[in-house]
């Protein structure tokens, strides 16, 4: 076992604070509308330029082991805030740095660290309650655009794109961000249910100019099995041909003579057919087939529930207004499913989301809800160079997380104003003893830090502006972008309540642990043994 280096008391805390400051100082230059960029060196390829706090934090490793421990703990604050709300990482880091710095000063002055922590926790609990009271629901498109704009570092086009996407696919819809091909940002919206499976044979194509299959008001056969024998399908094919409508077959697979016969029927124009594989694998495939059945008012033909393909009738088939299939995707538009049944299915999946333990499962379930309830929007980010593309894509993703958080828990005045108002409201809060009161003061002072940092980054005098904002009330604050005072909500400077709340809670949680640290243990660096020198008589 390697030998350890141990530091106690003030020695340990000073080292830890130095690490905290290195990381926080690198992150906090990005805060606010006039925040600067940070350039990150990569082991290969061009450097990355970012204004995203958590991306900067993740890159930082310090040589000194004790300092690095301090830096890593603050990195945890940024990561946790990012996981919870997808944004607010820089705010969380600034809050943590302030609480740790002020807290360690109090510890050095002889206060009891545990009571300080209790005081800080007490203040944060009260502050979160006040934040909830200040929160305003964020429902209209304009407010959503404003939140997106602020989070994308005052880029209005991004805010508008996100608001437009949310309007089209609903609050539940899936919105994804991809790298575009041109210079302009674009928004693609897919109405209806889309899944990643294309036609099984190019002979089904009936729109050669677009290379796709289009079926108008088709019947939809859903089978949870492989179809290789055409005899199983004859009754359904005959019934569909009589009805004079096209048929879409979604099955585990269609192969051999069954596929060949379908192709021949299509080419001769006897019955218009297209076949695709069912989306997903295993149990997820069964669930997705059931989703499509709900959407199109059909039944999944599955031997598990005693249904056989030979006995299927037109009543078992789903229907939709239109189906478009290309080589990679299938889109079912306007299924005839009953709205109440679809909502019931959505509620059932939501319940599974609540119970899901892994992020992957949760994401897949949310996609299913979106496909049933809203639709899918893709924001394609345009830029002139690869470096700009990466930076912009990260900003758009941040803005998307922020707008989601805003829709979830509402918004408060931005620019650090909400925390100043909250601190004003709980200024009279008292702890059980004097040391707890100092802890409360440490937390209250930290709540000014985000506003001060935004102002510093804008090149103004922090104390003057902080006092002016404190003297105002409600959503009165300082707009660092236009350098004027006014009503932040009216000026469209909004922060999602969830982002501000998460930043404060995670910052206080980690900072409280660091203030109560009394000892730090790390491995001693291994001393490299010197090379063996040349022995006597070995001269060339």
From Swiss-Prot:
CDD domains: GroEL. This is Chaperonin GroEL. It comes from the Bacteria. GO terms for cellular component: cytoplasm. NCBIfam families: GroEL (TIGR02348), PRK00013.1 (NF000592), PRK12849.1 (NF009487), PRK12850.1 (NF009488), PRK12851.1 (NF009489). Together with its co-chaperonin GroES, plays an essential role in assisting protein folding. The GroEL-GroES system forms a nano-cage that allows encapsulation of the non-native substrate proteins and provides a physical environment optimized to promote and accelerate protein folding. It is an enzyme of class 5 (isomerase). Keywords: ATP-binding, Chaperone, Cytoplasm, Isomerase, Nucleotide-binding.
């Amino acid at each position: 076992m390697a030998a350890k280096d141990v530091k106690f008391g003030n020695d340990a805390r000073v080292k830890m604070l130095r690490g905290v400051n290195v990381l926080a100082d690198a992150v906090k230059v990005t805060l606010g509308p006039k925040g600067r960029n940070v350039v990150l060196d990569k082991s290969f390829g061009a450097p990355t330029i970012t204004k995203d706090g958590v991306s900067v934090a993740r890159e930082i490793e310090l040589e000194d082991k004790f300092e690095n421990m301090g830096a890593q703990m603050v990195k945890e604050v940024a990561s946790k805030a990012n996981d919870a709300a997808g944004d607010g990482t820089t705010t969380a880091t600034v809050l943590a740095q302030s609480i740790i710095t002020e807290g360690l000063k109090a510890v050095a002055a002889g206060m009891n660290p545990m009571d300080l922590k209790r005081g800080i926790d007490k203040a944060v609990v009260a502050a979160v309650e006040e934040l909830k009271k200040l929160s305003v629901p964020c429902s209209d498109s304009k407010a959503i655009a404003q939140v997106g704009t602020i989070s994308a570092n005052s880029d209005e086009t991004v805010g508008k794109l996100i608001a437009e996407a949310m309007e089209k696919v609903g609050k539940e819809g899936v919105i994804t961000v991809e790298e575009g091909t041109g210079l302009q940002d674009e928004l693609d919206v897919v109405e209806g249910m889309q899944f990643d499976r294309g036609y099984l044979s190019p002979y089904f194509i009936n729109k050669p100019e677009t290379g796709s299959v289009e079926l108008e008001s088709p019947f939809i056969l859903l089978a949870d099995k492989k179809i290789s024998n055409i005899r199983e399908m004859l009754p359904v094919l005959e019934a569909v041909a009589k009805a004079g409508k096209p048929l879409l077959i979604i099955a585990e697979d269609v192969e051999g003579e069954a596929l060949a016969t379908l192709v021949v029927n299509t080419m001769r124009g006897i019955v218009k057919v297209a076949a695709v594989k069912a989306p997903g694998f295993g149990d997820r495939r069964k669930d997705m087939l059931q989703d499509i059945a709900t959407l199109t008012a059909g039944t999944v033909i599955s031997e598990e529930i005693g249904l056989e393909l030979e006995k299927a009738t037109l009543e078992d088939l789903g229907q939709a207004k239109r189906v478009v299939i290309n080589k990679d995707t299938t889109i079912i538009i306007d299924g005839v499913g009953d709205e109440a049944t679809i909502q019931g299915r959505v509620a059932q999946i939501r319940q599974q989301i609540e119970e899901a333990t892994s992020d992957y499962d949760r994401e897949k379930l949310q996609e299913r809800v979106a496909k049933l309830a809203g639709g899918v929007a893709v924001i394609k980010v345009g830029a002139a160079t690869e470096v700009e593309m990466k930076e912009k894509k990260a900003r758009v993703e941040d803005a998307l997380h922020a707008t989601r958080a805003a829709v979830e828990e509402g918004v408060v005045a931005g620019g650090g104003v909400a925390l100043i108002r909250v601190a004003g409201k709980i200024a009279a809060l008292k702890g059980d003893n004097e040391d707890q009161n100092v802890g409360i003061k440490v937390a209250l002072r930290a709540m000014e830090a985000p506003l001060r940092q935004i102002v510093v980054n804008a090149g103004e005098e922090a104390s003057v502006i902080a006092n002016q904002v404190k003297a105002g009330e409600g959503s009165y604050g300082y707009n660092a972008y236009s350098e004027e005072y006014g009503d932040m909500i009216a000026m469209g400077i909004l922060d999602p309540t969830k982002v501000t709340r998460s930043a404060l809670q995670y910052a206080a949680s980690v900072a409280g642990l660091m203030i109560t640290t009394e000892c730090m243990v790390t491995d001693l660096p291994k001393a490299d043994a010197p090379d063996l020198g040349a022995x006597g008589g070995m001269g060339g």
